[in-house]
């Protein structure tokens, strides 16, 4: 991973824990829950899913399946959300294609509240026309325009219990330090190598 890696205009090399020929996986600046990671094409001009070439597309979804399996194993998740917000009107917050992988659990399941959180996930990307469409989406048609900002994560009106995998309210989701993200990326890289070596069948996804 010597060559600089960018997420839109942002240098994210030290957040990357896996890289294939056309794709990479990185830890999150403001994860919704522990284990919330992103799959991103290396080519920064890929704004939408349809912008991928055939080789890029094959590599992208192969990487997605590998990291999906790994995150479920690593974080002992019962289920996984796989989310692509394809364009600003769909809630995409950074003008570079990316797929969210988010662990989910039987206990403290927040249901569809996770999608509200995705609407406010922000990597601070900007392109003039693209950002204008994003602002319009948030102002008149965004999910949050239809609901009030939540101060605590609830399900059916009941406040969720505390725990490491509980979805945090936006006020508690702070931008993480680079050193913290670098350490997490290094740990996940080591664990991913262990995961792949534990099952010879997984090498086909590399």
From Swiss-Prot:
Lineage of origin: Eukaryota, Fungi, Dikarya, Ascomycota, Saccharomycotina
PROSITE patterns per record: HIT_1, HIT_2
Main function: Cleaves A-5'-PPP-5'A to yield AMP and ADP. Can cleave all dinucleoside polyphosphates, provided the phosphate chain contains at least 3 phosphates and that 1 of the 2 bases composing the nucleotide is a purine. Is most effective on dinucleoside triphosphates. Negatively regulates intracellular dinucleoside polyphosphate levels, which elevate following heat shock.
Name by which UniProt lists this protein: Bis(5'-adenosyl)-triphosphatase
GO biological process, one term: nucleoside catabolic process
Ranges spanned by the short sequence motif Histidine triad motif, renumbered to the chain: 96-100
Disordered: annotated segments: 143-164
Family matches, as InterPro entries: Bis(5'-adenosyl)-TPase_reg (IPR051884), FHIT (IPR039383), Histidine_triad_CS (IPR019808), HIT-like (IPR011146), HIT-like_sf (IPR036265)
Entry cofactors: Mn(2+)
Catalytic activity reported: P(1),P(3)-bis(5'-adenosyl) triphosphate + H2O = AMP + ADP + 2 H(+)
A single cellular component GO annotation: cytoplasm
A single MF term (Gene Ontology): bis(5'-nucleosyl)-tetraphosphatase (asymmetrical) activity
Gene3D superfamilies, alphabetized: HIT-like
Positions of the catalytic residues: 98 (tele-amp-histidine intermediate)
Main localisation: cytoplasm
Keywords, comma-separated and alphabetical: Cytoplasm, Hydrolase, Mitochondrion, Nucleotide-binding, Nucleus
Cofactor note: Divalent metal cations. Mn(2+) is the preferred ion.
Quaternary structure, from the entry: Homodimer.
Gene: HNT2
A Pfam family hit: HIT
Subcellular localization, as worded in the UniProt entry: Cytoplasm; Nucleus; Mitochondrion
Domain (HIT): residue spans on this chain: 3-115
Note: Present with 1920 molecules/cell in log phase SD medium.
EC number(s) per entry: 3.6.1.29
